From Swiss-Prot:
Residues 289-309 are annotated as: Disordered. It comes from Saccharopolyspora erythraea (strain ATCC 11635 / DSM 40517 / JCM 4748 / NBRC 13426 / NCIMB 8594 / NRRL 2338). Coiled coil: none annotated. One of its GO terms (cellular component) is cytosol. This is Methionyl-tRNA formyltransferase. GO terms for molecular function: methionyl-tRNA formyltransferase activity. The keyword Transmembrane helix does not apply. Attaches a formyl group to the free amino group of methionyl-tRNA(fMet). The formyl group appears to play a dual role in the initiator identity of N-formylmethionyl-tRNA by promoting its recognition by IF2 and preventing the misappropriation of this tRNA by the elongation apparatus. Keywords: Protein biosynthesis, Transferase.
Amino acid sequence: MRLVFAGTPEPAVPSLRALIESANHEVAAVVTRPDAPAGRGRKLMRSPVGALADEHGIEVLTPAKASDPEFLARLRELEPECCPVVAYGALLRQTALDIPEHGWVNLHFSLLPAWRGAAPVQAAIKHGDQITGASTFRLVPELDAGPVYGVVTEEVRDTDTSGVLLERLSVSGAKLLVATLDGIADGTLRAEEQPADGVSYAPKVEVEDARVDFTAPARAVDRLVRSVTPDPGAWASFRDERLKLGPVSIVDEDLGLAPGEIRVERRRVLAGTGSAPVALGEVQAQGKKRMAATDWARGSRIEQGERLK
């Protein structure tokens, strides 16, 4: 099929690459978010999807809004049969959805109808899901509510961060997306409506959502930290400054630590929770580089009874 692909961040790159390499499809153009400042110099940078398209000489469209008349006119001129979309990052209105013959097919990183929204991988880890996956579905105006073409499942490992899990899903999801488009093209695949039961939502994770509540049980602390690693990154307040926290380890010992109370040992730094303590891995104080918690603790001269809040 003749395709126009929409996507922006790194997790969308495997899907675009797989479609470029597919013998059954032609990527006529790519739609991505406008170039944005990045890096220390804050220079305007092409999105990862846009950069891959440039490498292959594919036309790149960067509308400020997907409802821009000029963009819609160019999309009609391209005459796509289908528009696959992976983490594009902008709202697509009905005027755009109606253009391709086979609609827009979205790759979403959850087993729909679970975790509709911007942060499905983070939600799966935070809530302790043992199995998650990816779904392909036809876009409709309602958020992630369209009929589903196919799914692929993925185990959530005890050590998975959202970054690690999303990387795996982006690879397996790319294969699912190609298979879905193959099935649409040859007429062998039909979408099925999502069930009314089991709907849940995963809104965008804000910085305040990533603050660790040490009154929660250790397992909840562990899951929260992993769910927001690497973005936006877990944190707590220490001496009235923000301290970023990397993944922690649950310690199966009763040390009598109050929630957030820090205990510095020779080889580890512990913090109390609502249940068992956790051992801190890497931390990053404001204006400092990321470092082992033991190095941070030695430099901070932590006094008995000090806490992470």
